[in-house]
From Swiss-Prot:
Expressed predominantly in the placenta, in syncytiotrophoblasts. Moderate levels in the adrenal gland, low levels in the trachea and very low levels in the bone marrow. GO terms for cellular component: plasma membrane. Its main location: membrane. This is XK-related protein 2. The gene is XKRX.
Amino acid sequence: MDRVYEIPEEPNVDPVSSLEEDVIRGANPRFTFPFSILFSTFLYCGEAASALYMVRIYRKNSETYWMTYTFSFFMFSSIMVQLTLIFVHRDLAKDKPLSLFMHLILLGPVIRCLEAMIKYLTLWKKEEQEEPYVSLTRKKMLIDGEEVLIEWEVGHSIRTLAMHRNAYKRMSQIQAFLGSVPQLTYQLYVSLISAEVPLGRVVLMVFSLVSVTYGATLCNMLAIQIKYDDYKIRLGPLEVLCITIWRTLEITSRLLILVLFSATLKLKAVPFLVLNFLIILFEPWIKFWRSGAQMPNNIEKNFSRVGTLVVLISVTILYAGINFSCWSALQLRLADRDLVDKGQNWGHMGLHYSVRLVENVIMVLVFKFFGVKVLLNYCHSLIALQLIIAYLISIGFMLLFFQYLHPLRSLFTHNVVDYLHCVCCHQHPRTRVENSEPPFETEARQSVV
């Protein structure tokens, strides 16, 4: 994963006197080539082109339903992508007719990518010149296990390029979970019931799978940045590899189980899937209603109450789309000022994976016992076992990341092992604990838990 600008690994130790605390003056940030912007644009264009090609093929073969669903998934995600980029860049308050026109014809990511490349080339040509407009940024860093506060200057051009990067990160998540996930699931379903896989559909499924994996990986990184906004965070290649393997196994196993379950029950599977999605969708709103809190008004200063409500609904739909296929790594709380729970909520993570594991086992058992006409030449028991094992392995990589590879794991009050130990402690009968431990030790253990 690239960064628009990065801080040297060993900042120049130049303490600056402050009334509150000592600050280390960091070296000026070095801007890097925005590979993530190019990659996100490539995924968007590739998936859009392959989806439109399959729409043309389905129309030529008079397969109306397949054509309609394929085109609908493409259009919905593309429109949401355009709205996301317009919202992040605040284009409605600016006079940019060309950008708005490109968004209107669903080519907004392309023009934004060109703008980012032009900005990068401008920075590259003026690398040795000092910018007249700069701002100071302060972040905490963990250096040799010690927390230090670092301050550095960020130029206006670098900040603009960083805004492009952040916009594309959010765009990639919108595309992944509101477009690529349903597209990939549906194309897998069509391939399963039609018993043929043309090259165009393979290309579309590959683009969708890469988009989903990339979006889920970004979801983890953005979750860490949101929870630890005061810290400068670095993820090394090993951490990114662990997250990628975890997310790939989790998403592929989950989607394959959904496809096999849907192919087995046909229309009978629709109520179960719709109910599952609606529970995730309305859960944050039910908690918000029960809390009795006011609707947050700090999302955008120029937004009316209706505009704020539209943004909250869009965020909730994205949150439900993420949790339907994988863990969102964040818990949405509409009653909070920041809209998310910034705590390390092990209980929410454990509940999500426990419920999803039970769901996957149930759907796999339905496929095993009732999927007579699905995959006639394959052993259903072996397929079911492999899918459950793949999902369990993804959980193992998730636990590995949080226990050993999380960049700020030293800030955890409790880690994965502590949480599992607490769960095991609660499973013991209380009478046995009371009889085997002195009162002082019992109170101490309960306080730790």
